[in-house]
Curated annotation (Swiss-Prot):
Record InterPro entries: BRCT_dom, BRCT_dom_sf, DisA/LigA_HHH, DNA_ligase, DNA_ligase_AS, DNAligase_adenylation, DNAligase_N, NA-bd_OB-fold
Residue ranges annotated for the BRCT domain, each copy included: 594-677
Molecular function via GO: DNA ligase (NAD+) activity; metal ion binding
Record SMART domains: BRCT, LIGANc
Domain of life: Bacteria
GO biological process entries: DNA repair; DNA replication
Its biological purpose: DNA ligase that catalyzes the formation of phosphodiester linkages between 5'-phosphoryl and 3'-hydroxyl groups in double-stranded DNA using NAD as a coenzyme and as the energy source for the reaction. It is essential for DNA replication and repair of damaged DNA.
Organism name: Anaplasma phagocytophilum (strain HZ)
Descriptive protein name: DNA ligase
Gene: ligA
Active site location: K120
Binding site for NAD(+): D34, A35, Q36, Y37, D38, S84, L85, E118, R141, E176, K283, K307
Lineage: Bacteria, Pseudomonadati, Pseudomonadota, Alphaproteobacteria, Rickettsiales
GO cellular component entries: cytosol
Leading EC class: ligase
Length: 677
C-alpha cells in the first residue's frame, strides 16, 4: 500500500467511524453490527501500527460517548470524566495490555498481578451521586463530561438504593443499566426497539417514571469514584453491603490463564444469564496501582475490555415467512442462505416486526447481518445496503393481511407495533404454541410431551386446548398409538407417567403455564405469593373481570392487570380453567419472606446425580421452603448440594469457601424442616 493509499484509507476509516459513532451514541440507531464496527477499529489500529507516520493525519480519535439528542432532559456535568474502555479483540491484545501494565509499574514480567475479571454488560452507563447517604441525582455517560439527568426514572429501577447507611459524605457509584431478555420479549410487541440495549436506553429516558418502572429496568454497580478502598474486590464487597446489585460472576485472577479461562467460560454460558454481555472487563485489582497507572484522555490504563468472538455473519435473505405465536403475535421470519455462525448452521432468523423491517429497509435478496447469541433465536440485526444487487426486490416488503394458520384478518392494537391474530382458540397455530408453553419446564414440566408429540396430537384433533392433555391417558387407551411412526410402548408409557407426575403443581408454575400475556415467570410468582391459593386468586380475578378495582400487587403493572382482566373475561378460558381445576392438585404458594425453614432466603445450587429424587424435583421442593435455586456457583451461593459425579461446580464451591452438602446431609437438613412443622 502506497503512502497516498494508506492516507486515503485512514481518512475513509475515520469518516466511517465518526458516522457510526453519531448513529450509535446520539441516536441509538446503529446501521452496522458491533462486529463490523470492531472490525473498522481493528483495521485502523493495524494501519497505524504498520504506518506510524500516519499519526500526523489521524484527525479523529473517536468518542467516549456522545450527548444524546434529547432536549427534554437537563444536562449534568460529571464530577469526574466517565471514560470508555480500550478494547482487546485477541489473546495477543490481552498479553500486550498485561505487559504494558507491568512495564509502566516497573514490575518484573514474571511477577504476577491480580486482575479483576467482570462481565461487560451491553447496556447504558450511569453515575449515581449520593450526599449524606441520600440519592441526589443520576446521569448517563453522555460524552464523558456532560450527561443527561435521568434521576426521576432511575429512582424506579429495582433495588437501586435511595438511602445508604454508613456512607461517606459524598459518594458516586457507577454502573450499567440494562434490560433482561424476558422483559424485552414482553416489550417488543408494543414498542419499536431493535434490541435490549436500545430498549433500556429508550426506557431510562422516559419523562414519565411510571413507564420506565413498568419496563422493569435493572442495573449492576461496579465502581466507587475516588474510593479509598484498597482493591476492586473490596469495592464490589462494599457496594453489595450497601445494597447495590453487583455482578454474580466475578473472578480475581492471579495469572492470565485463569483470566482467559473465565473469558471462555462466560462466552460459553452467556446464553443462560438472561441478559446481554459482549465481553469481559479486566481491571488491575489494586486501586493504588490503578492510580499510579492513570488514564489517557479516553481510557483508563489499568483496564481493558476483552470482547467476545463475533456471533454475527452476513448471508443472503432468500424469503420472508411469518409464524404465529401463542398470543397471536405474527412474527416475520427471515429465510436465509444457510450459514455457519459459532459452529451452528443457521437458515432462519427473526425479523421482529413490520416496523423493524421498514426501519432497516430489509428486502428479499439483500445481504443481511445475522446475529446468534448462545441459545437465543438468531435475529437479523442489519442490512449491507452497499451490497444490494439488482436481484433484490425493489418494493418494500408487504406484510400479510390474514393469519397464515386460520385465515382471520390481522389487526394491530393502538400503541402496539405487532400485528396479531385475534382468533385465539379457533386458531390452530396459537393452540399449538399455548400447549408448548403449558408443558414447558417453568410450566407443568411434562417432559415426555415434546414439540413433535404436541404437533401430532394437535393435528389429529386430540388436543384443542391445554386441558385436553389430561384426557390423553384415556384417549391413548382407545387408539392404536404404537402403530404410528415414532411411537413405541416405552415412549407411550413415559408420556403417561409424565402426565401423571405433572398433576401436582405449584400455583406460580400453574399461572405461568396459562400463557397469559405479560405474565412471565417473575410476575406469576408475585401474583401467587400475593394470593397464596388457587381459589383466592380465581375469586380476585373474577371480581376484576366484573369491573372491580384490582388489588395492589408490587411489581405488577397496569398492562399485566388489563391482560388478566381480559383473560378472565373469556368464556373459553373459564371453561378450560374449570377443567384444569378438576384434573390438577394446585399447591398453595409459600412466600419466601414468611417461610420459617432454615433454608429460607438462601441461594442453593444442585449438582451431580441425586439418588432419591431428580435435581429438578429437589429444586422445586427447596423453592417451596423459601430457598432461591441457582444454576451456577457464585459468591452469592449459600449451599451447594453435591450428588455423585459432581463436576466443576464442586471445585468452584470449595475454592470460594461455600458450604457443601452431600445428599445425606441435605436430607438430614430437610428432616429438621419437617420436624418443625
Amino acid at each position: 500500500m502506497s503512502d497516498n493509499d494508506s492516507r486515503r484509507r485512514l481518512a475513509d476509516l475515520n469518516a466511517q467511524l465518526k458516522l457510526h459513532d453519531v448513529l450509535y451514541h446520539e441516536h441509538d440507531a446503529p446501521e452496522i453490527s458491533d462486529a463490523q464496527y470492531d472490525a473498522l477499529v481493528q483495521e485502523k489500529r493495524e494501519l497505524l501500527e504498520k504506518f506510524p507516520e500516519l499519526s500526523a493525519y489521524n484527525d479523529y480519535e473517536g468518542v467516549i460517548g456522545a450527548l444524546t439528542v434529547d432536549a427534554r432532559l437537563p444536562k449534568i456535568a460529571h464530577r469526574e470524566p466517565m471514560l470508555s474502555l480500550e478494547n482487546s479483540f485477541t489473546i495477543q491484545d490481552v498479553e500486550k495490555f498485561i505487559s504494558r501494565v507491568k512495564r509502566s509499574l516497573n514490575m518484573d514480567p514474571e511477577v504476577s498481578i491480580t486482575i479483576a475479571c467482570e462481565p461487560k454488560i451491553d447496556g447504558l452507563s450511569f453515575a449515581a451521586l449520593y450526599e449524606k447517604g441520600s440519592l441526589i441525582r443520576v446521569a448517563t455517560r453522555g460524552n464523558g463530561h456532560l450527561g443527561e439527568d435521568i434521576t426521576n426514572t432511575a429512582k424506579v429501577i429495582r433495588k437501586l438504593p435511595h438511602k445508604i447507611a454508613n456512607a461517606p459524605e459524598v459518594l458516586e457509584v457507577r454502573g450499567e443499566i440494562y434490560m433482561h431478555h424476558s422483559d424485552f420479549e414482553k416489550l417488543k410487541d408494543v414498542c419499536n426497539f431493535a434490541n435490549p440495549r436500545n430498549a433500556a436506553a429508550g426506557s431510562i429516558r422516559q419523562l414519565n417514571p411510571k413507564i420506565a418502572e413498568e419496563r422493569n429496568l435493572r442495573y449492576v454497580a461496579y465502581c466507587i469514584v475516588n474510593s479509598a478502598l484498597a482493591s476492586q474486590e473490596a469495592i464490589l464487597k462494599q457496594l453489595a453491603e450497601w445494597g447495590f446489585c453487583t455482578h454474580t460472576e466475578v473472578l480475581f485472577a492471579d495469572n492470565m490463564d485463569d483470566a482467559l479461562s473465565f473469558h471462555t467460560r462466560m462466552y460459553n454460558t452467556r446464553s443462560t444469564l438472561g441478559y446481554d454481555i459482549d465481553g469481559i472487563v479486566y481491571k488491575v485489582n489494586d486501586t493504588h496501582l490503578q492510580k499510579l497507572l492513570g488514564s489517557t484522555s479516553k481510557y483508563p490504563r489499568w483496564a481493558t475490555a476483552h470482547k467476545f468472538p463475533s456471533t454475527e455473519a452476513i448471508t443472503k435473505l432468500r424469503d420472508i415467512s411469518v409464524q404465529v405465536g401463542r398470543t397471536g403475535v405474527i412474527t416475520p421470519i427471515a429465510e436465509l442462505e444457510p450459514i455457519n455462525i459459532g459452529g451452528t448452521l443457521v437458515s432462519r432468523a427473526s425479523l421482529h416486526n413490520l416496523n423493524e423491517i421498514a426501519r432497516k429497509d430489509i428486502r428479499i435478496g439483500d445481504s443481511v447481518i445475522v446475529k446468534r447469541a448462545g441459545e437465543v433465536i438468531p435475529q437479523v440485526v442489519g442490512v449491507d445496503h452497499t451490497a444490494r444487487c439488482n436481484s433484490a426486490v425493489p418494493e418494500e416488503y408487504v406484510f400479510p393481511s390474514h393469519c397464515p394458520s386460520c385465515g382471520s384478518t390481522l389487526s394491530r392494537a393502538p400503541g402496539e407495533v405487532a400485528m396479531r391474530c385475534t382468533a385465539e382458540l379457533s386458531c390452530q397455530a396459537q393452540v399449538l404454541e399455548r400447549v408448548k408453553h403449558f408443558v414447558s419446564r417453568d410450566g407443568l414440566n411434562i417432559v415426555g410431551l415434546g414439540e413433535k408429540q404436541i404437533e401430532f396430537f394437535c393435528n389429529a384433533s386430540y388436543i384443542s386446548n391445554v386441558a385436553d392433555i389430561f384426557s390423553l391417558r384415556e384417549k391413548i387407551s382407545h387408539m392404536n398409538l404404537s402403530a404410528e411412526h415414532g411411537w413405541g410402548e416405552k415412549s407411550i408409557a413415559l408420556l403417561i407417567n409424565a402426565i401423571n407426575a405433572s398433576t401436582t403443581v405449584k400455583l406460580s408454575n400453574f399461572i405461568f403455564a396459562l400463557g397469559i400475556r405479560f405474565i412471565g415467570k417473575g410476575a406469576a410468582k408475585l401474583i401467587a405469593e400475593h394470593y397464596r391459593s388457587y381459589s383466592a386468586w380465581v375469586r380476585a380475578m373474577t371480581s376484576l373481570a366484573n369491573g372491580e378495582d384490582p388489588d395492589n400487587i408490587h411489581g405488577i403493572g397496569l398492562k399485566s392487570i388489563e391482560s388478566l382482566r381480559a383473560f378472565f373475561s373469556s368464556e373459553d378460558n373459564l371453561r378450560v380453567l374449570q377443567t384444569l381445576e378438576e384434573k390438577l392438585n394446585i399447591l398453595n404458594e409459600i412466600a419466601n419472606t414468611e417461610t420459617a425453614s432454615p433454608i429460607s432466603g438462601k441461594t442453593i445450587v444442585f449438582t451431580g446425580v441425586l439418588e432419591d429424587m431428580s435435581r429438578n424435583e429437589a429444586a422445586k421442593y427447596a423453592e417451596t421452603l423459601g430457598a432461591k435455586v441457582g444454576n451456577t456457583v457464585t459468591t452469592k451461593t449459600d449451599i451447594l448440594v453435591a450428588g455423585s459425579n459432581s463436576g466443576s461446580k464442586l471445585d468452584t464451591a470449595r475454592k470460594l469457601g461455600i458450604q457443601v452438602m452431600n445428599e445425606s446431609e441435605w436430607k438430614d437438613l430437610l428432616k429438621t424442616v419437617s420436624n418443625s412443622e
